[in-house]
Amino acid sequence: MQRNLVVLLLLGMVALSSCGLREKHFQKLVKYAVPESTLRTILQTAVHKLGKTQFGCPAYQGYCDDHCQDIKKEEGFCHGMKCKCGIPMGF
């Protein structure tokens, strides 16, 4: 049952993240949806790690630029799986 809940929550988070919701929204969802336990701690850690990794970066060309314009009003660059604001790639 808990495994099904975890999978359902993660799929829901992936679906909602495509709508532009940020990590803090998912943390709040986990806080209210999952009772306080080891499972909640694991889910919060997973949400934080996934929130730090921007999977859209290599797949969607303008993701980093949109992300950095939203946060810092700078040009964004994709560095592997993570966006860097105002730091161009140095090859």
From Swiss-Prot:
Tissue spec: Expressed by the venom gland.
Q: Which PROSITE patterns match?
A: BSPN_CSAB
Annotated localization: Secreted
Q: Signal sequence: where?
A: 1-20
Q: Which residues form the propeptide?
A: 21-27
Q: Which terms in the Gene Ontology molecular function aspect does this entry carry? A: potassium channel regulator activity; toxin activity
What residues does the BetaSPN-type CS-alpha/beta domain cover?
Answer: 54-91
Origin organism of this chain? Buthus israelis
Which cysteines are disulphide-bonded? 57-78, 64-83, 68-85
Keyword Disulfide bond applies: yes
What GO terms fall under cellular component here?
A: extracellular region
- Highest taxon listed in the record's lineage: Eukaryota
| Name of the protein this chain belongs to | Potassium channel toxin BuTXK-beta
Give the protein's biological function.
Inhibits voltage-gated potassium channel.
InterPro entries named in the record: Long_scorpion_toxin_alpha/beta
Protein family according to the UniProt entry: Belongs to the long chain scorpion toxin family. Class 1 subfamily.
Report if keyword Calcium is assigned: no
Q: Which UniProt keywords apply?
A: Disulfide bond, Ion channel impairing toxin, Neurotoxin, Potassium channel impairing toxin, Secreted, Signal, Toxin
